[in-house]
Amino acid sequence: MDPATTLAPLDAALEGLGQGRAEESLSAVVSHLAGLRAASSVESWNAFLSHVRNHPLREAVHRDPFIFRCYSKPRGYAPDAAALDYVLRARELPVRSSDPVSAIHHFATNGQAARALRFRRDAIAREIDAVASRAARPARIFAAGAGHLRECDKSAALRAGRVGRLVAFDMDAENLDAIRREYPTLPIVTHHGTVRQIGEGRHLFGDMDLVYSSGLLETLPHPSAVGLARALYTMVAPGGTLFLTHFLPGLTEAAFLEAYLDWRMVYRKHADLFDLVKELPAETVATWVFSESPEATLGVLSIQKR
């Protein structure tokens, strides 16, 4: 891979940003990097990333607080829940709308990945409402990798008191602090722990009407993802639902996310997602339903227990 040739589109994008053409310029970078990543081995792509990050375009896009927070990883991982709030809550920027940073921020928080994140939040909220409407009692829910739990903003059942308990499980204590601070009147119980501890059965929760995971499976290799799915399924009560979300390989922005946000995920196809749960006892499963976002960038697997 010749850096001089492959970096030329980044030169053009930097010039375009200076001319007020952020959308056009960054879209071209997304397409260019996606093509390079698809045609490269993992080793050559990772080596090329150092050239991308040494190009002055990185400094320009890192003026956006969402992109830079992901890349800088103040909590040790990307993206953290505070970064995702730029996408899920449209946090205001302390800059004028005419500032080039505003255009970069709009691109980053309204692109393909951002739309998938909002789809995920809304899909979880709809599932909470659906489960609560079917439950004979106030619903019991377990959220693995809760983040800031922004599905609460969209769930009618939570606001109406049809959820009896929502266990918010997360490895980041700051996320749990934010949940307690921002949703003090909701029936949320926070619990600090790791994915590994769930997989090992060290945090035992049961009799849940809904158990869901958002953003965890993409961070795990296959054996760990299988173990997490199996452990979460054991928490589901008869008639309850395991709800798994996962980014799909159709995310064109993947190379851009890796280059400028250092946001790396394991992308799994439809069949790969089913492969994570194929060892669940078939006699205990009532239904398996797979759906995906309109752009086929995020998959949802819903498993109802007998």
Regions found by a protein language model. Give the residues of each.
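Class I (Rossmann-like) S-adenosyl-L-methionine-dependent methyltransferase catalytic domain
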Residues: 1-39, 43, 47-55, 91, ...
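Conserved beta-strand/loop positions that form the S-adenosyl-L-methionine
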Residues: 144
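A short beta-strand submotif of the Rossmann-like class I SAM-dependent methyltransferase core
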Residues: 213-216
